[in-house]
Amino acid sequence: MKIFTALLSLALFLALTSVAFAAPADRVDLKRVTKSRAAVVDYWTAERMRNAIPAERAQGGSSSKAQRAAFSSYEYPGSYTTFPASTHGKVFFTLGGVNYVCSGTAVNSSNRSVVWTAGHCVNEGPGAYATNWAFVPAYRDGSRPFGTWTARTLVTSSAWANQGNISYDVAGAVMNTHGGSALTDVVGGRGIAFNYNRNQFFTSFGYPAAPPFTGQRLWVCESNLLTSDPTTSPQTMGIGCDMTGGSSGGGWVVGSSVYTVNSYGYSNQRNVMYGPYQGSVAQSVYNAASTR
């Protein structure tokens, strides 16, 4: 059984333990946000942010052979408010009346407003969309140096939203303007890559919040591609990483571009993080988010 780095529901478990689904012809699913920006900002008090919870961890093994992970892991040492660290941030949202945390990355787009994250950070997969969706770039110890940005549209793959297919666990959240400015005009934006060679050296970013981490600092893992998950189709990619719940949606960067996001792990594969391969379906999600 897989371990998610954010919300897990019974429906999610059922979806993940079933056979892999093909990506549907209608590749994109989205939800327009009706709650006002001011209402979402007011909702996310310092106390609610502090008490929002990270992953629920599933127990049990997997059908994948356990791997020995070789990787580096460390707290980001530089300034959070200087590009490119300023593009990484903490995500807050509500599902089923419970407040959760994820991670995300501001990426370049035509509307200058897209946060790239995991599908399960916007939708139960399958199930409801998140509410009160907010992104705090350069979050550190409760500080919000660039303010709280709220979503106007949440976009994910229909394979995730309708089937819970982990191979398509990606999403783009389109942000409202803040102080009259678009997101990447303020914090900058990473590039984003699709249909690439899998064999890369990845630098993964996130805000792990389950023990031994606190979710208050940006964390980094560095690893070559370690493995692929044969239980998924297309196969997801695995790297060495010890990040825990709350890091979901954090970007895996190669050069200056996001190649995938933190998605899940297995209980019998310690220190291995998986992320979807960003092919044409992920590109469709990005294109839809970029034009909203």
What are these regions (language model features)?
Residues G265-R292:
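C-terminal cap/linker of serine protease catalytic domains
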Residues A22-N108:
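Protease-domain processing segments flanking chymotrypsin-fold serine proteases, especially trypsin-like
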Residues F71-N99, V107-N108, A128, N132-A182:
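Conserved catalytic-core segment of clan PA serine endopeptidases
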Residues M1-L8:
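Positively charged n-region of N-terminal signal peptides that target proteins for export
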Residues T81-R140, E222-T232, G240, S263, ...:
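Catalytic histidine site
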Residues D242-V261:
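Catalytic nucleophile loop of clan PA
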Residues A151, I166-G240:
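Chymotrypsin/trypsin-fold serine protease catalytic domain
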Residues L8-T17:
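Bacterial N-terminal signal peptides
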